[in-house]
Amino acid sequence: MAFWLQAASLLVLLALSPGVDAAAAQHLCGSHLVDALYLVCGEKGFFYTPKRDVDPLIGFLSPKSAKENEEYPFKDQTEMMVKRGIVEQCCHKPCNIFDLQNYCN
C-alpha cells in the first residue's frame, strides 16, 4: 500500500511540475531511484547488480601506493573509467524514463 502511495505521489509531482514533460531528465538516487524503477518496470521487475565495494581492497595497497594516491588524485575519476551502471546513469547524472526502462526485465 505504501509503495502505491509513493508511486502516486511521484506521478503527481511529475504531472504538476511546470514546463516539465514525463521524459524530463532527473537525478534519482537511493530509494527514489528504486521507487522510480518499480513504477516504470511494474510487474516485470528490474535488473540491478550493485558494484563491489572497493574499500576492503584498499588495505591490500602498500603504504607507498596509498600515499601516491593521496598526492596525485585524479582530476576526474570518471575520465579514467567508463561506468554504465544505473547509479552512474541516474544518480550522478540526470536520466529520463526511457533510461529507466533499459533496466526493466
Swiss-Prot record:
Signal as UniProt keyword: yes
Disulfide-bond pairs as recorded: 29-91, 41-104, 90-95
An example Gene Ontology molecular-function term: hormone activity
UniProt-annotated location(s): Secreted
Cellular component, GO annotation: extracellular space
Main location: secreted
Record family assignment: Belongs to the insulin family.
Protein name: Insulin
Gene name of the record: ins
